[in-house]
Structure formats: C-alpha cells, structure tokens
Amino acid sequence: MPVPGPGQVLVRIEMSGLCHTDIHAAHGDWPVKPSLPFIPGHEGIGRVDGLGAGVSAPAIGTRVALAWLGSACGSCRYCVTGRENLCLAQKNTGYAVNGAHAEYAVVDARFAVPVPESVTSLDAAPLTCAGVTTYAAIKAARVTPSERVAVFGIGGLGHLAIQYARLVGAEVIAVDVSEEKLK
C-alpha cells in the first residue's frame, strides 16, 4: 500500500473512469510520454484513508475526486491567476504521478477535491475529466442565457457540453454525423 508523504493524502479508490488519455498513455502514442512505471487513471473517486505530514484537510473519510491535474507549483503566473492547468510544473494524475486504476492512490491534498455525498461515485468519476473540460469551455466562452450554442460531436464530452449550456440558459444546437446520438 502506498504511503502519503508531506502534503499528501492516501485515498481508497471507489470508482475510476477510463478516459482515452489513459489509453494513449498505455500505448505510449502521445509525443509526451508518461513517467514509467505508472498506474493510469485520472477519473478517480474515493475516500481519504490516511494523511501525510502537515495535512489537516481533507479529513479522513472525506469523499474526494482525483483529477487530471494532480499538482501544480502554486506560485507561477498561471497558478496565481487560477490557471493551474497551464502551469509548466504541473503533474498529471495517471501520467506523471500514479493514478486511480488501483485500490489506493496517493494524492496532493491541495488537489483532492471533495465530492458531495448526493453524487454517486459512478456519476462523479467522468466529471473529473470530461466534465471539467466541457465546463471550462462553456465558462471560457462566457455563455449567457438565451444565447445560441452549437455543440459539434455528441459523444463523451459533447453530451456534457449540452447539459452545461442548458444549465446556463442557452439555446443548444447539437450537431453530429450519427443520427442515433442526436436523439
């Protein structure tokens, strides 16, 4: 069993989604290769089971998400403006640090995101990647009520983009080559 270091928590994994990024990492077909050996999985949900030195939150027993962004420096121009995803020192879960396709994972406590008990682990897991990706797009586009939004490709991310756009009150146009996906 892994042991959490300073600033880390040990998470007992309840659910881990499979993303195409995990498949690319396993096949090694991206220009940036994962750190070997590695455990893939960046769509993990679990409960904090142990605390490393200096960690008081999240508390033991807290249900948390492990996302693609496993850690960032916290002090560069990107991090201090809330754009940690652009940090040049970021470490990605299941790629640069071991991921959630295991019974336990060690996670940077700053990036272990509490998950409400009202959301099942099955529902929460894909939100840590596809959900965050599509939410970020809707947010970056500054979609407002009554605006028209076209979503191209109604697959794993597209169906979430439709839901987020509707939640902000947009009129959504779904576009796909598959008639089945448009139903």
PLM feature segments, named:
Residues 2-16, 29-77, 116-118:
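Glycine-rich beta-strand-centered segment in the early N-terminal region that forms part
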Residues 21-27:
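Cytochrome P450 core scaffold surrounding the K-helix E-X-X-R motif
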Residues 22, 43, 176:
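Acidic active-site catalytic centers that drive phospho-/nucleotidyl reactions
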Residues 43, 62-63, 78, 104, ...:
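Residue-level marker of beta-strand positions
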Residues 58, 67-113:
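Cysteine-cluster motifs in flexible loop/terminal segments that predominantly coordinate metals
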Residues 45-51, 101-123:
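Short Fe-S-cluster ligation motifs
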